[in-house]
């Protein structure tokens, strides 16, 4: 999973809605938010691998008309999701078994 900051240009009469629609229609996008700050959007993208997410950003997201730039942040570890604290000890044990 990755959080992607998207810089975009607004369009006359519709603002950011059209570029947002071009982005949120992709099945890889699980959540999308218009935000205040240095970027216009935060997009949550789910993929099986970092490469899959990177390919989505490079081949589908970045070329969209109206998208000026992106910054991708890969989630390395989760501590709390949807109000639920992730059991770190259990997570660490699973990692040990896999390696």
Place the predicted regions along the sequence by residue.
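A compositional/biophysical signature of low hydrophobicity enriched in polar/charged and small residues
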Residues: 1-99
């Amino acid at each position: 999973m990755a959080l992607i900051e998207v810089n975009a240009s607004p369009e006359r009469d519709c603002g950011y809605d059209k570029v947002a629609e071009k982005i949120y229609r992709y099945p890889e996008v699980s959540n999308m938010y218009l935000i205040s700050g240095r970027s216009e959007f935060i997009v949550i993208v789910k993929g099986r691998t970092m490469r899959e997410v990177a390919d989505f950003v490079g081949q589908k997201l970045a070329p969209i008309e109206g998208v000026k730039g992106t910054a991708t942040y890969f989630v390395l570890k989760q501590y709390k999701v949807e109000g639920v604290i992730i059991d770190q000890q259990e997570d660490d044990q699973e990692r040990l078994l896999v390696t």
